[in-house]
């Protein structure tokens, strides 16, 4: 029997996958897919890895432990730091020099060198559902207008851009590895919008389908102009982003701006027709329903899948011709 997965996440360079389960946590190497580390514990609701280091951010599943974040050196098997929060930890992300922690109402930013609290972002008392971090910026949905995304500086704790993404609540947001784009999907799940982080302009709209289905994971290709998404029905759609922003190295500006791209989009039927693109390739996860994470591999034309059902899959993607993606590998996560 596969273990019941509670959390899964690839590290920043996509080389390792960390898994939290009812019985502890594991770390797997992506290529070739092999188990590197396993630890029996009282369950892990969050398990994040810092690049290829032995440092993991870890949260237990027991009710009394969900407010406690531990930084663990898994090689030496010691707890380096413990931080208590006023409410349960909802998400944790690493950058090369920052630790970012989300709880209800707040985002905490720490300096990784000394674990000094640098900034706290107030997200009000609403629920932050969509949350992503890239280098010096964090993206999260507006609790008051959940179809909007804020981009905020980790160094100043100031929102620099407000982007109108969807008419319904944003459910998933992801940064391009270079940070110049974000992709968003709403609870409806029929389209994914790709938007520049510098000025919030709409780059393209990618249509998953016309029947609503929850999109649970989005991933940009690290080099090529492709994006993949996985929905709750187990279908992976791969899109080619043929329209690229003019300045891929740009960053959000230092003052708050409100994107007008969404209003332009609504008032331009012509733009809606040519800017909506169908999938380039597809894959079918062999499960009746799916919840988990997908990611483009950094070591080849592959999509990797970690399912909360306790399974790992790897699909081949033909980046030249598209079409159906062949299932190359299947693995069951061990307890």
Curated annotation (Swiss-Prot):
Gene3D superfamilies, sorted: YVTN repeat-like/Quinoprotein amine dehydrogenase
Keywords: Autophagy, Cytoplasm, Golgi apparatus, Membrane, Protein transport, Repeat, Sporulation, Transport, Vacuole, WD repeat
Membrane topology (UniProt): Peripheral membrane protein
GO biological process: one example: glycophagy
KO phenotype (gene knockout): Impairs atg8-processing.
InterPro entries: PROPPIN, WD40/YVTN_repeat-like_dom_sf, WD40_repeat_dom_sf, WD40_rpt
Mapped WD repeat ranges: 165-205, 210-249
Compartment list: Cytoplasm; Golgi apparatus, Golgi stack membrane; Vacuole membrane; Preautophagosomal structure membrane
Molecular functions per Gene Ontology: phosphatidylinositol-3,5-bisphosphate binding; phosphatidylinositol-3-phosphate binding; protein-macromolecule adaptor activity
SMART domains with a match to the protein in the record: WD40
Function: Required for cytoplasm to vacuole transport (Cvt) vesicles formation and autophagy. Has a role in sporulation.
Family stated for the protein in its record: Belongs to the WD repeat PROPPIN family.
Name listed for the protein in its UniProt record: Autophagy-related protein 21
């Amino acid at each position: 029997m596969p273990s019941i997965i509670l959390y899964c996440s690839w590290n920043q360079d996509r080389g390792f996958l960390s898994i939290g389960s009812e019985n502890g946590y594991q770390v797997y190497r992506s290529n070739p897919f092999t188990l590197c580390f396993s630890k029996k514990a009282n369950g892990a609701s969050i398990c994040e890895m810092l690049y290829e280091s032995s440092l993991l951010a870890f949260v237990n599943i027991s009710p009394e432990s969900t407010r406690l974040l531990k930084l663990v050196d898994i090689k030496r098997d010691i707890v380096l730091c413990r931080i208590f929060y006023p409410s349960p930890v909802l998400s944790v992300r690493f950058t090369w020099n920052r630790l970012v922690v989300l709880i209800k109402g707040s985002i905490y930013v720490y300096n990784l060198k000394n674990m000094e609290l640098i900034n706290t972002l107030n997200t009000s008392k609403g629920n932050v559902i969509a949350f992503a971090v890239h280098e010096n910026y964090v993206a999260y949905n507006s609790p008051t207008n959940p179809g909007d995304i804020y981009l905020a500086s980790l160094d100043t704790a100031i929102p620099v851009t407000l982007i109108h993404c969807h008419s319904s609540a944003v459910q998933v947001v992801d940064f391009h590895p270079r940070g110049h784009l974000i992709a968003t999907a709403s609870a409806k799940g029929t389209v994914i919008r790709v938007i520049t982080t510098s000025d919030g302009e709409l780059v393209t709209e990618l249509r998953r389908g016309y029947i609503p289905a929850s999109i649970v994971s989005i991933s940009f290709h690290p080099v090529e102009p492709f994006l993949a998404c996985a929905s709750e029905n187990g279908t992976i759609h791969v899109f080619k982003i043929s329209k690229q922003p003019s300045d891929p190295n740009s960053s959000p500006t230092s003052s708050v701006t409100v994107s007008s791209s969404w209003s332009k989009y609504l008032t331009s039927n012509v733009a809606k027709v040519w800017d909506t693109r169908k999938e380039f390739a597809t894959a079918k996860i062999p499960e009746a329903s799916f919840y988990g994470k997908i990611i483009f591999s950094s070591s080849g034309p592959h999509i990797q899948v970690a399912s909360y059902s306790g399974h790992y899959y790897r699909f081949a993607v033909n980046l030249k011709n598209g079409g159906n993606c062949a299932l190359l590998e299947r693995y069951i996560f061990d307890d």
